[in-house]
């Protein structure tokens, strides 16, 4: 059970203008893009940022996520989180990046855990 990386979600009204702003701010460039067309969500990865655009309805609980942890075994993390009292809000679910799980911890913080494909 290991965290392989972390990401901070940035929610934007316009993905392209947000990408321009954050590329200028960080000096980084977008490395990947994903779409969830069934929910009207567009996502861009830029360094340790995940820029997300979509309607409040499409975003659902995702709009409340404060941090994303990339993990080696989502099943192990799910068991650990449940055992320590976290509430599963969504998932495990398949996404373009892999499988994710969204939980609320005991402090009320909403966190996403993702086991990346490949």
Residue spans for each PLM region:
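N-terminal beta-strand motif that seeds the catalytic metal site of vicinal oxygen chelate
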Residues: 1-19, 65-67, 117
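Vicinal oxygen chelate
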Residues: 1-3, 10, 31, 84-118
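Conserved active-site tyrosine of GNAT-family acetyltransferases
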Residues: 18-23, 81, 108
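Conserved short beta-strand elements that form part of the metal-binding/catalytic scaffold
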Residues: 29-64, 110-116
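Short hydrophobic/aromatic beta-strand element in the GNAT-like acyltransferase core
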Residues: 43, 68, 100-102
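Mid-chain, well-packed structural core segment of small domains
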Residues: 66-81
């Amino acid at each position: 059970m290991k965290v392989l990386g972390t990401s901070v979600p940035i929610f934007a009204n316009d993905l392209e203008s947000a990408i321009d702003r954050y590329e200028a701010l960080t000096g980084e460039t977008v490395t990947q893009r994903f779409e969830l067309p069934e929910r009207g969500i567009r996502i861009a990865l830029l360094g340790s940022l995940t820029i997300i655009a979509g309607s409040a309805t499409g975003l659902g609980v995702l709009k409340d996520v404060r941090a994303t942890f990339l993990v080696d075994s989502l099943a192990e993390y799910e068991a650990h989180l449940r055992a320590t009292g976290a509430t599963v809000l969504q998932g495990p679910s398949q996404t373009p990046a892999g499988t994710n799980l969204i939980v609320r911890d005991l402090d009320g913080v909403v966190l996403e855990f993702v086991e990346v494909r490949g």
